[in-house]
Curated annotation (Swiss-Prot):
A divalent metal cation binds at residues 35-36, 128. Its cofactor is Mn(2+); Mg(2+). The lineage of its organism: Bacteria, Pseudomonadati, Pseudomonadota, Betaproteobacteria, Burkholderiales. It comes from the Bacteria. Endonuclease that specifically degrades the RNA of RNA-DNA hybrids. Its EC number is 3.1.26.4. This is Ribonuclease HII. It comes from Paraburkholderia phytofirmans (strain DSM 17436 / LMG 22146 / PsJN).
Length: 248
């Protein structure tokens, strides 16, 4: 899934030559902000967004880390961002890619797709977190960037709203899991549904609670009602990012 905007592709002469430069921001830079949503959930894709703002235009008010905004505010800002951004792209990595690559590398893949899908070529990509995907342009990891860099804040909002809407669609075909309530995260409601119904094709079988629920039901030994599946903190904290994501 990739959504993008802008009528034609633009680039800046010499951008590739600046790739290895030490000056990470010059007045001529076209800065792109990148963030993701959905590293921690037990189900659904991981979604990334890339946003470029026109520096000559007034900045959208109210941009912030999507996690501190209400759903209503995120929806309002989503419409403003897609209307006023110089360019944006929303991309994802599938559940199958998450299970085959691990969540870290699938997230990097979604981010790479978002940047490469932009209709305007950036000269500097600022990414929330402490890792950057392999890109053909300069990139910089910004810890806490979704609250510090406006284009990253915008990307976090696009990614979050898009993914939440995708999980609402999944709820229509798989209502027993309550995706409309938790967006795939490992809440008690979701874990209970996994115990009772087992995982569906949209669950991440590389994640321990899903894998264990599938194993219990496939062997005819469902979890007792009082038994608790231990869920790694990476599933609940979208800022907890590291290789351990593959072993959840």
């Amino acid at each position: 899934m990739t959504l993008s905007r802008a009528p034609r592709r633009k680039t800046v002469a010499g951008a590739s030559a600046q790739q290895v430069g030490l000056n990470f921001e010059t007045p001529d830079d076209i800065v792109c902000g990148v963030d993701e949503a959905g590293r921690g959930p037990l189900a659904g894709p991981v979604v990334a967004a890339a946003v470029i703002f026109d520096p000559s235009k007034p900045m959208i008010r109210g941009l912030d880390d999507s996690k501190v905004l209400t759903a209503k505010k995120r929806d309002e800002l989503y419409d403003k961002i897609v209307d006023r951004a110089l360019a944006y792209c929303i991309a994802s990595a599938t559940v199958e890619e998450i299970d085959s690559l691990n969540i870290l590398h699938a997230t990097m893949l979604a981010m790479k797709r978002a940047v490469e899908g932009l209709s305007v070529v950036p000269t500097l990509v600022k990414i929330d977190g402490n890792r950057c995907p392999t890109l053909s342009v300069r990139s910089e990891a910004v810890i806490g960037g979704d609250a510090l860099v406006k284009s990253i804040s915008a990307a976090s909002i696009l990614a979050k709203v898009t993914r939440d809407r995708m999980l609402l669609e999944l709820h229509q075909t798989h209502p027993v899991y309550g995706f409309n309530a938790h967006a795939g995260y490992g809440t008690p409601q979701h874990l209970k549904a996994l115990r009772e119904h087992g995982p569906c094709e949209h669950h991440r079988r590389s994640f321990a609670p899903v894998r264990e629920a599938h194993l219990r039901l496939s062997t005819g030994m469902p979890l007792p009602a009082g038994e608790v599946i231990v869920v790694s903190e990476v599933m609940f904290d979208d800022d907890a990012f590291g290789e351990r994501g593959s072993a959840v």
